[in-house]
């Protein structure tokens, strides 16, 4: 079941579902986010692809594209361990991970696993950045 907060960014891709949140929730999609989406679509032909730019919740300049969360549902994951699934995603995004992307949280499921639990993970608040803003002396 798709949560209501994601439906405004719903995009159809040839019978697949792509949930897009835009750059840090702004609705705009930046070049890194667009490249990530394109590469994952090409490499994994996902049935569901959710990509969130979570950079806005971190100590980075506004408009940054450094922290992402991705949920990928693909039949390519059948018979693969979670580590093997993550390696497929990392291989597809090698250029981004070597450059602008600092953090990538991954949910990689088969269609059957998604059918059993379509709950999307959420990220905890950022604890990095300027410690003075976190109440530490």
From Swiss-Prot:
One Pfam family per UniProt: BolA
Major subcellular site: mitochondrion
Mitochondrion is among the record's keywords: yes
Domain of life according to the entry: Eukaryota
Keyword terms: Mitochondrion, Phosphoprotein
Mitochondrion among keywords: yes
Region (Disordered): 114-137
Signal peptide: none
SUPFAM superfamilies named in the record: BolA-like (SSF82657)
GO terms under cellular component: iron-sulfur cluster assembly complex; mitochondrion
Protein localization: Mitochondrion
Residue positions, PTM Phosphoserine: 81
Its biological purpose: Acts as a mitochondrial iron-sulfur (Fe-S) cluster assembly factor that facilitates (Fe-S) cluster insertion into a subset of mitochondrial proteins. Probably acts together with the monothiol glutaredoxin GLRX5. May protect cells against oxidative stress.
Protein family membership: Belongs to the BolA/IbaG family.
Summary of subunit composition and partner proteins: Interacts with GLRX5.
Name of the featured protein: BolA-like protein 1
Organism from which the protein derives: Pongo abelii (Sumatran orangutan)
Gene this protein is translated from: BOLA1
């Amino acid at each position: 079941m798709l949560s209501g907060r994601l439906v405004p960014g719903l995009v159809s891709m040839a019978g697949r579902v792509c949930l897009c949140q835009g750059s840090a929730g702004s609705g705009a999609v930046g070049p890194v986010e667009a490249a990530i989406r394109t590469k994952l679509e090409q490499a994994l032909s996902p049935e569901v692809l959710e990509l969130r730019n979570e950079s806005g919740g971190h100590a980075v300049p506004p408009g940054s594209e450094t922290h992402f969360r991705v949920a990928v549902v693909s039949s390519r994951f059948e018979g693969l361990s979670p580590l093997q699934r993550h390696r497929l995603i990392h291989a597809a995004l090698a250029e981004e991970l070597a450059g602008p992307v600092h953090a990538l949280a991954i949910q990689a499921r088969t269609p059957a696993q998604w059918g059993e639990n379509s709950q999307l993970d959420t990220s905890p608040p950022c604890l990095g950045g300027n410690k003075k803003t976190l109440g530490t002396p």
